[in-house]
Amino acid sequence: MKNYSIRPYQESDYELWNTFVSAAKNATFLFHRDFMEYHKERFEDFSLLVFDKVKLVAVLPANRVGDKVYSHQGLTYGGLVYSSKLKIEKIETILDLVFDFFKSKRIEHFYLHPIPSFYLGQGNAAIDFFLMKKGAQLYRKEMNMVAQLHQEIPISKSKLKHFRRTELLGLRVVEETNFQPFWEKILEPRLVEKYAAKPVHSLTEIQLLHERFPQNIKQFSAYLEDKIVAGITIFEFENGVKSQYGATSKKGEKYRALDFLFISLLDIFQKRGKLFFDMGIVNDSGEKGFHSGLLQQKEELGCTVWNQDFYKIKLV
């Protein structure tokens, strides 16, 4: 490790960090500083940069809470991001360096949930192997429901039948840059009504993120007679897309507008050459550990289960 060095991220690293993330083989736009920092007041940043002599070879998006470090509590996933040219064996060397740095800062536990493997055409299994070798504990799994777009999508016959019926009603799918109709007329009121909850992102935040990442954050809405009845907020990546939010009005439920929108988007992104459609997790806090209704809905939309893994490692 004599040629390697490590230090915390600082504001002057903004361009260096973003350029590296853009070229890395295991990163998405969620690791761009403009995304990570839209809510920076909520987290104590503890991101790290690793150098081989003067060349940046890895970064770790992370936040600190007392004697614990997370990668990352403000993101859907985190993990060690490394150069596409980095040899696999060097990943272990870099992990050792990161853990030694943590110990020097009196960090006792490190929590990590790596980017799911289906996001990465080249895979990301090496980090899992080395984490387990270092004594990490796989303490949690979440079921990600994912449709594979590079093959025929096994949408259920009943979903397709209702799709064709709804299509005859004249529902229109619209991609729009204004998130307000969906947020204020559909998403926020339905979350309050059904779960007494709010979306993770406020309208102001999602609009800001869309302005920062117009090619990645998109809003698709279903309209019937010029009234919005459903919406899906999409995060778009190089290889695929994720439905970050999806909801429908009571009127939309009657016409199965959300399913109509999902099937329409599956077709749209399949034709655009995307490889996967991530419809999110179905875990909940109930006895089963998952939401049966959501699982069935997404399975009938052609999804299968891909795991999201969560690791923790005791450092001292």
What are these regions (language model features)?
Residues 60-62, 81-83, 92-99, 216-316:
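Aromatic (often tryptophan-rich) hydrophobic motifs at membrane interfaces
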Residues 75-121:
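A gly/proline- and charged-residue-enriched helix-loop-helix capping module
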